[in-house]
Every structure is written in C-alpha cells, then in structure tokens.
Amino acid sequence: MIRVCICGGGSLAHVCAGVLSFQSEVEVNIFTRQPERWSQHIIVTDHEGKTYKGNLNVISNNPQEAMHDCNIIFLCLPGFAIESTLECIKPYIGNAVVGSIVCSTGFFFTAHRVLGNNARLFGFQRVPFIARTTEYGHAANLLGYKPQVSIAVENMEDKEEFRKIVESLWLTPTKLLHSHYEASLTNSNPILHTGRLYSMWKDWNGELYSHNILFYKEWTVEASKTLIAMDKEFMQLLDVLPVTPGAIPSLLEYYESHDAISLTEKIRSIVAFQDITSPMKEVDGGWIPDFESRYFTEDFPYGLKIIIDLAKENNIHTPNLNKVFEWGMSKCMKKSET
C-alpha cells in the first residue's frame, strides 16, 4: 500500500486526489486549510467520459494527522505557498519523499533551503494533467493527459524504481531528468503565459472587452513573436547551466512549429486548450484584465523571476524577458498596493 498526502486544494490537487485514490493499492490523505469543504468521496471525469471514483482517507488541516505514515507528500500549491507549507510540515515528513506537481515556481530551490540538501525530493517538469475543479472538494474534470512527463529525483538510492512508481500513480509514461534545473526551468507557464499576457495587455488603458478572450483559441501572431524572442534568451541561459541538451526543448520544437505563424496555428488548434479563458473579470459593460489572477501573482514573481535571477547570475543578456517581467511586476505591485 502506498500512502500519499496531497497538500493543496486547487484543480490539480482535486484531479490527482481522484486519479490516485481510484487505485486500489493507494491511500490518499488531503492536507488543506479547508477540510470542512471536502467530501470523503471524489469523482474525476476525463474528456472522454471516463470516471475515477475514489475514497479519501484523511482530510485535515493538521499536518501531523495528514502526514502520518505517508510514503509520499505531494505539493499541489501556488509558488507563494511552497515555503510556508514546507516549514509547516517539516517536523512531520519523516522518511517520506516530498514532491511537487509544479517546479517552475521554485520548489527545488525552496526545498533545498528549508529541508536541506539531503532531502528526498521529486518534481514534474510539466504537469501531467490539464485540470478544472467542477465542485470544490467533490468533483473535477481531467481535460487532457500528457503523452509523456519528465521528473527530477534527488537523494534516492533507486531512482528508476521511483520513476516506475510515479508512472504507475499518475498513469503517464515518465522519464527521468538529469538535474533539478531541468524540472525547475521551463518555458511553459513562466514564458508561455507571461508572453501572451504581455502581448494582450501591454498597452491596455482601461477599455472594456466584449467577452472573455479565449487564451489559446484566440492566440495571436504577436503573442507568438513575443514568445519566440523570450524563448531564444531562455535557451541561451540553459546553455550555461547543468542541463542536458534537448531536455528542455524550445517552444518551436515543443509545438512542432518553425515560425510565429505556424506556432500560432498550432496553439490555436490544440483541442484540450479550446475552452480555456483568459484571466479577466466581468464588470459593468464588459470585461477587463484580472491582475489579481494567478497568471499574474504566480507566473511573474515566482516563475519568470527564477529565470531572470539565474540569467543575471550568469551574465546572460535578456532584454525581452526583462521587458515582459518588468511590465508584469508593475501590474502585480499596483494590485498589492491597493
């Protein structure tokens, strides 16, 4: 029996809870600030109608209770919550492996600082599922699987055996990365999201939109040009870090494209992305950007910032990354000051 404690209550936490607890040899605990909102039973439905019905073992806001006898402690948390959560659970980790579904917001760097360099850690390079909560604590939709995921693993005697466990638990072909940099640094959310947001709203001056823009389906060539410029600088950073060539493909390579036009067509056509909207909020008369969305509060100060800081440390010139970062942070700072 494998016992997993999932920390968090977002969409990915819901889907992981359902998929893992559906498996007969897995027990799932939930560590959450809102245990009263969770049911002992969870249902996850994928895009083809397959359902994962699971029973949750322990649901608690008490870390000692939630972590008891767990083999794996798995964080499904926003970047700002990682350090405080690790500090909170540190006394109760015991021999468990600590992992994160997202590493691009600093999981490994923070875990090294809080738990020490000998902690047993793992983390995904990209999330294994596209997830949306439909009823908090009860149900979620699994909108898409990944054909393959990659994980970084540290301080484990048999990394291959652990890779097999992850592959089995998350129902996705899994390969091992060579260093935590390969999981921590990604051109997914920190560049894909931020570049798109910059292209959408860098010149926004208060006008109303008639609808919530579809983030991917209404993708623009301008957004693709911004991404390609940012990604080129990101690739220059990877060249000077202990990253295996090809471990983190360029965005053009990942999306099987060769220029801004083909990248735009590819992103617009991804079925699992079709209904994903932009971080906007409805007001009288229309829609406006929501600068308090996690797209801003997560991807700029925790995702893109890691890349910016490493580039500075390694003397990599990143004018496009800097431009987008400074714009995004100016929006975050304005909201934090109100």
Predicted regions and their residues:
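Active-site-lining helix/loop region of Rossmann-like oxidoreductase modules
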Residues: 150-253
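Nucleotide donor/acceptor-binding cores
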Residues: 2, 96, 147-149
